[in-house]
């Protein structure tokens, strides 16, 4: 086992604070509309240019082990905030640095770190309550666009794209971000439910130009097993043929005689049909078939519920306004399912999301909610170079997370003003003793810091601006991008409540852990001695025997 370096008290804390400051100083230059870029070296390819706090934090690894511990703890603040709220990483880092800096002064003066922590926790809990009270729900598309624009470093076109996407697929719909092929950003919207299974035979294609199968007003047959015997299908096919409407078959597989018969009927124009495999695997396949059934107002024909193919009637089949099937995807548009049943199903899947333990399961469940609730939108990011594309794509993803957070918990005035207003409301808070009061004071001081940093990055005098904003009321604040004072909500400078709340909670959590640290254990660097010179090869005598 490697030897350890054990450092106690102020010496340990001082080294960790140095690490905190190195990381926080690198991250905080990116804060606000006039924040600067940070260039990150890559081991291969060109460097990455970013204004995203968490991307900068993740790159920082310090040589000194104790400094690195401090830096890694603040990196955790940025990562946690990014994971929970999707934005606010730089704000969280600035808050954490301030709480650590102020807190260390009190610890050095001999105050009890545990009481300081209790005071900090009390102040943060009170501030979060006040933030929730001053928060207002996002109601308009314009507000969503403004939140997106602020999070994307004041890029209004990104905010507008996200608002447009949310308009089209609903606030529950899935919005994904991909690399575009042109210089402009594009928005592709897939309405209805789309799943990644295409036609089982190209002979079903009835639109040769687009190479797709289009079925108008079809019945939808859902079966959870393989279909290989046409006899099982005949009763349903006859009923559908009498109704004179097309049929989409979604089953585990359709093969052999059954597939051949469907193809022949299709070519001869006797019955317009198409067959696709059911999406997913195992239990997920059953769940997705059930989703399609609820969306189309049909039933999954399964032996478990006492239904068989031979006895299936038109009442068991789902219906849709249109179905489009490509080589790799099937889209069901405007299913005939009951809106109440769909809503109940969405609630049920949401409950499963709450209980899901793995990120993969959660992501798949969220996709199912989106497919049931609205649709899928894809924002294709356009840029001139790959470096610009990466940077812009990261900003679009940030903005997307921020708008989701705004929809979830509402919005507050941006530009660090919400924290100042919450601070004013809790300024009378008292702890159980003087040390707890000092903990409360630490948080009150830290809540000014984001505004100070935004103003500093904009090149103005922080103390003057903070004093002016404190003198104002409500949403009155400083718009750093224009250099004007006024109602920030009207100016469109908004922050999601969830982002501001999460930043404060995570910063206080990690910073107070650091204040209560009294010993740090780090590995000592190993002295790797240079390897010895290799000896000559044995058995090589003189050259006498060669004569």
UniProtKB/Swiss-Prot annotation:
Amino acids binding ATP: 30-33, 51, 87-91, 415, 495
SUPFAM superfamilies per the UniProt record, alphabetical: GroEL apical domain-like (SSF52029), GroEL equatorial domain-like (SSF48592), GroEL-intermediate domain like (SSF54849)
EC class of the enzyme, as a word: isomerase
UniProt catalytic activity: ATP + H2O + a folded polypeptide = ADP + phosphate + an unfolded polypeptide
A GO cellular component entry from the record: cytoplasm
InterPro entries the record matches: Chaperonin_Cpn60_CS, Cpn60/GroEL, Cpn60/GroEL/TCP-1, GroEL-like_apical_dom_sf, GROEL-like_equatorial_sf, TCP-1-like_intermed_sf
GO biological process: protein refolding
Pfam families reported in the protein's UniProt record: Cpn60_TCP1
Compartmental location: Cytoplasm
Tagged with keyword Signal: no
Mitochondrion is among the record's keywords: no
Keywords assigned: ATP-binding, Chaperone, Cytoplasm, Isomerase, Nucleotide-binding
Chief site of localization: cytoplasm
Highest taxon listed in the record's lineage: Bacteria
EC number: 5.6.1.7
GO molecular function, one term: ATP-dependent protein folding chaperone
Subunit structure: Forms a cylinder of 14 subunits composed of two heptameric rings stacked back-to-back. Interacts with the co-chaperonin GroES.
Stated role: Together with its co-chaperonin GroES, plays an essential role in assisting protein folding. The GroEL-GroES system forms a nano-cage that allows encapsulation of the non-native substrate proteins and provides a physical environment optimized to promote and accelerate protein folding.
Family according to the record: Belongs to the chaperonin (HSP60) family.
The protein, known as: Chaperonin GroEL
Species: Ralstonia nicotianae (strain ATCC BAA-1114 / GMI1000) (Ralstonia solanacearum)
């Amino acid at each position: 086992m490697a030897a350890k370096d054990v450092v106690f008290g102020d010496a340990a804390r001082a080294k960790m604070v140095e690490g905190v400051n190195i990381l926080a100083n690198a991250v905080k230059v990116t804060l606000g509309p006039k924040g600067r870029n940070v260039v990150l070296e890559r081991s291969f390819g060109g460097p990455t240019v970013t204004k995203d706090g968490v991307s900068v934090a993740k790159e920082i690894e310090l040589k000194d082990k104790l400094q690195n511990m401090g830096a890694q703890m603040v990196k955790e603040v940025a990562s946690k905030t990014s994971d929970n709220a999707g934005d606010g990483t730089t704000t969280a880092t600035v808050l954490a640095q301030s709480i650590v800096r102020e807190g260390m002064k009190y610890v050095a003066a001999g105050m009890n770190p545990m009481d300081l922590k209790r005071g900090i926790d009390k102040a943060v809990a009170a501030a979060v309550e006040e933030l929730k009270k001053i928060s207002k729900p996002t109601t308009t598309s314009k507000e969503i666009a403004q939140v997106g624009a602020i999070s994307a470093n004041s890029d209004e076109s990104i905010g507008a794209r996200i608002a447009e996407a949310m308009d089209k697929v609903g606030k529950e719909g899935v919005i994904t971000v991909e690399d575009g092929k042109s210089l402009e950003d594009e928005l592709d919207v897939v309405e209805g439910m789309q799943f990644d299974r295409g036609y089982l035979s190209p002979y079903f294609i009835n639109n040769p130009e687009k190479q797709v199968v289009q079925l108008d007003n079809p019945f939808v047959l859902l079966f959870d097993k393989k279909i290989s015997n046409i006899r099982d299908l005949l009763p349903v096919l006859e009923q559908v043929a009498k109704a004179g409407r097309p049929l989409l078959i979604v089953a585990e597989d359709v093969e052999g005689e059954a597939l051949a018969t469907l193809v022949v009927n299709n070519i001869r124009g006797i019955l317009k049909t198409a067959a696709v495999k059911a999406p997913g695997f195992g239990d997920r396949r059953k769940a997705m078939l059930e989703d399609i059934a609820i969306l189309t107002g049909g039933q999954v024909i399964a032996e478990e519920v006492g239904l068989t193919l031979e006895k299936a009637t038109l009442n068991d089949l789902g219906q849709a306004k249109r179905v489009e099937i490509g080589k790799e995807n099937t889209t069901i548009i405007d299913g005939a399912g009951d809106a109440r049943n769909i809503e109940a199903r969405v609630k049920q899947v949401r409950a499963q999301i709450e209980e899901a333990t793995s990120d993969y399961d959660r992501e798949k469940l969220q996709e199912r909610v989106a497919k049931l609730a609205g649709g899928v939108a894809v924002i294709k990011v356009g840029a001139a170079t790959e470096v610009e594309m990466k940077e812009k794509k990261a900003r679009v993803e940030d903005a997307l997370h921020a708008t989701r957070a705004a929809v979830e918990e509402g919005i507050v005035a941006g530009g660090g003003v919400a924290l100042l207003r919450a601070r004013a409301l809790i300024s009378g808070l008292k702890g159980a003793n003087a040390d707890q009061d000092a903990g409360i004071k630490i948080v009150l001081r830290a809540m000014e810091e984001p505004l100070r940093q935004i103003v500093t990055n904009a090149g103005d005098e922080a103390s003057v601006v903070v004093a002016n904003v404190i003198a104002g009321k409500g949403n009155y604040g400083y718009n750093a991008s224009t250099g004007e004072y006024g109602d920030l909500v009207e100016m469109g400078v908004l922050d999601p409540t969830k982002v501001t709340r999460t930043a404060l909670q995570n910063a206080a959590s990690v910073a107070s852990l650091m204040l209560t640290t009294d010993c740090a254990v780090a590995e000592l660097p190993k002295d790797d001695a240079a390897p010895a010179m290799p000896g000559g090869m044995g058995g090589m005598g003189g050259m006498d025997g060669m004569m």
